[in-house]
């Protein structure tokens, strides 16, 4: 069966619109990665840009440097995982099979 080039171009235009909609949805995602019972909280958007890092002051004196570094790393990794999951949940039903 031959493919009509005009139909193909129409479909490509729709595909571009879908991509633009995905980008908009993804940019609106905001997640919080947490570590150490919320001692460290990292807020990140769907484009993996960190918007905020919060470290509870009352734990500074109780934590050594290595423990704090580990919690910060864990909170970042948690946020990254959550962004990936949000992107996956928003796009899986909308992307045509095989793409």
Curated annotation (Swiss-Prot):
Keywords: Cytoplasm, DNA-binding
Primary localization class, coarse: cytoplasm
Compartment annotation: Cytoplasm, Nucleoid
Source superkingdom: Bacteria
Example of a GO cellular component annotation carried by this entry: cytoplasm
Pfam families named among the record's database cross-references: YbaB_DNA_bd
Cross-referenced Gene3D superfamilies: Nucleoid-associated protein YbaB-like domain
Keyword DNA-binding: yes
Alphabetized InterPro entries for the sequence: YbaB-like_sf (IPR036894), YbaB/EbfC (IPR004401)
DNA-binding in keyword set: yes
One GO MF term: DNA binding
Membership in a protein family: Belongs to the YbaB/EbfC family.
Summary of subunit composition and partner proteins: Homodimer.
Function: Binds to DNA and alters its conformation. May be involved in regulation of gene expression, nucleoid organization and DNA protection.
Protein name listed in UniProt: Nucleoid-associated protein EbfC
Organism: Borrelia turicatae (strain 91E135)
């Amino acid at each position: 069966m031959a493919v009509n080039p005009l139909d193909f171009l129409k479909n490509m235009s729709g595909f571009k619109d879908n991509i633009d909609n995905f980008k908009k949805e993804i940019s609106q995602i905001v997640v919080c990665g947490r570590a150490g019972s919320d001692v460290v909280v990292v807020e990140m958007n769907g484009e993996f840009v960190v918007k905020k890092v919060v470290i509870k002051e009352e734990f500074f004196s109780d934590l050594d440097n290595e423990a704090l570094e580990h919690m910060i790393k864990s909170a970042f990794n948690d946020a990254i995982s959550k962004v990936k999951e949000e992107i996956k949940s928003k796009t899986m039903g909308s992307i045509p099979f095989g793409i």
